[in-house]
Amino acid sequence: MIEFRGLAKQFGTRIVLRDIDLAIVPGRITGIIGPNGAGKTTLMKSILGLVRADCGDVVVDAARDATYRSRIGYMPQIARFPENLSTAELFAMLRDLRGDTRPVDQQLVQQLGLQTYLDTPLRVLSGGTRQKVNAALAFAFTPDLLILDEPTAGLDPVAAGILKDKILEQRELGRTVVITSHILAELDELCDDVVFLLDGTVRFAGSVHDLKLRTRQFSLERAVAAMMTAGAAA
């Protein structure tokens, strides 16, 4: 389980997270949703240790220290790769850094068509192919927890479908997925639960079904729009 206990973060005079108390249920797919600037990326990066909270704790499976991070697969919205390496060299470098001799998920590499680019320098890959490499890295080494930031951005429909199937497969394997996307129809398809952030606070945390019931809407997109309208009027 991922727990946020009194988490707060401020950048200069801008308050990004306000006293977040939240639990993310293990073995489920949870979407972090909200408008731009709501604190979604900051919340996700706090799990990874890429953002340090001003106060409060992030606890993963009862661990407050950084030991749990070796069990995380992370797919950033925009990946930064060493441009001089080939795709295969990048995979090998990460195996060495992690001290893990297991190969990258070869099935996913094949499905995404990356075998053609294993010897290609990363600097010459197209944006869509780089995003496929980004996805393969996130699922490498069979992580217990996946943090995915706009995972299908830049992917063609076939690759996006392959990736969504891979995400759904993780739930069947009992793994936890935390995902953010501006494509709410995609989250409606994938997620069991959602956390709706607005102005750095949690306005809803629960199942997608319960959010639709609460807002009396038939889709996640309309439910979120209703929450945002209600928040603006408050």
Residue positions per predicted region:
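Catalytic Walker B motif of ABC-type/P-loop ATPase nucleotide-binding domains
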Residues: L146-E150
